[in-house]
């Protein structure tokens, strides 16, 4: 049955409707392995719901750096049930009023997972075509996004676009940045400013453990031809992490040896979205690795020392 089947009303949900349920379900099956699936799995399992996550690939959050995705998948398996490498083939009535998700693995074997509710969290696709902007001559790309230039202008004079309708990074802070760009450019047509697209925008995944990322993953940096330096620093290697009795959480930095600048940062662990902010600042302002590592004080015994040590572990020295 489809999402709009009346028989499924109140039992089959999207991320919009799942937040409006009046009672906590005893069991929930979540379809998908991205950040929406991960965050809702965290929320409902924390409340005591028996959560089963069904995902097509062999790990959750596969768009994250490979190390982070691997560690998160291992951590998630300790909190709720994972069914990986499964392709959903049917959704049918189960027992006792529950829904049954039927899946198939690579060998063609079928499985069934039941839940009081099912959350479809397999991602969102752009729906800009519903705006009918083509009637005004505005161009859209093959993915359904409105095409804009670096100043957020469309191909039609006087029409601007920002946020999810034109940017593949569907993040509130990205839309906020572009809103400021558009506001400035509307008020100052002779002094246009461009949106900052120098690196992959930062984002956070608010789960347990928390995740934060900015810029290129290691694989993407190598594929782009950079002279890559990588450092992985465990939380437990610094005093604050040791005091937390931390296990399995880390900071991963990716840098270019030739330019001495950071290319990306990926963190899994407590306060990841706070820890990553100084890295975002360094990447935004052009501070290189040696300057960031040794050009400031790092408070001891704060958790930020894990960033300091990761920078030093990159092995990138200042010019003599």
Labelled PLM ranges:
Residues 50, 81-82, 139, 227, ...:
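Residue-level detector of anion-binding/catalytic polar loops
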Residues 206-217, 222-320:
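Flexible, glycine-rich terminal cap/loop adjacent to redox cofactors
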Residues 13, 81-83, 229-231:
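General small-molecule cofactor/ligand-binding pocket signal
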Residues 8-25, 112-192:
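FAD-site-proximal beta/loop scaffold in flavoenzymes
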């Amino acid at each position: 049955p489809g999402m709009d089947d009346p028989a499924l009303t109140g039992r089959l949900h999207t991320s919009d409707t799942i937040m409006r349920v009046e009672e906590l379900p005893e069991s929930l099956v979540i379809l998908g392995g991205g950040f929406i699936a991960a965050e809702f799995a965290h929320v409902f399992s924390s409340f005591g719901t028996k959560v089963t996550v069904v995902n097509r690939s062999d790990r959750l959050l596969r768009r994250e750096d490979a190390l982070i995705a691997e560690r998160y998948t291992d951590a998630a398996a300790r909190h709720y049930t994972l069914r990986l490498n499964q392709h959903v083939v049917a959704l049918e009535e189960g027992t006792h009023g529950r829904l049954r998700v039927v899946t198939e693995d690579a060998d063609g074997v079928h499985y069934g997972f039941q839940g009081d509710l099912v959350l479809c969290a397999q991602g969102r696709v752009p729906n800009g075509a519903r705006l009918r902007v083509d009637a005004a001559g505005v161009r859209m790309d093959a993915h359904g996004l409105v095409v804009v230039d670096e100043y957020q202008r469309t191909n039609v004079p006087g029409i601007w676009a920002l946020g999810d309708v034109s940017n593949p990074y569907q993040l509130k802070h990205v839309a906020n940045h572009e809103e400021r760009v558009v506001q400035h450019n509307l008020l100052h047509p002779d002094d246009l400013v461009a949106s900052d697209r120098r690196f992959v925008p930062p984002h956070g995944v608010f789960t347990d453990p928390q995740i934060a990322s900015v810029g290129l993953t290691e694989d993407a940096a190598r594929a782009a031809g950079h002279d890559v330096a990588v450092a992985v620093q465990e939380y437990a290697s610094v005093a604050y992490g040791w005091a937390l009795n931390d296990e399995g959480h880390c900071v991963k930095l990716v840098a270019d040896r030739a330019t001495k600048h950071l290319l990306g940062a990926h963190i899994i662990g407590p306060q990841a979205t706070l820890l990553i902010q100084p890295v975002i600042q360094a990447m935004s302002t052009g501070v290189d690795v040696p300057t960031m590592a040794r050009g400031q004080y790092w408070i001891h015994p704060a958790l930020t020392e894990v960033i300091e040590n990761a920078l030093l572990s990159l092995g990138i020295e200042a010019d003599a």
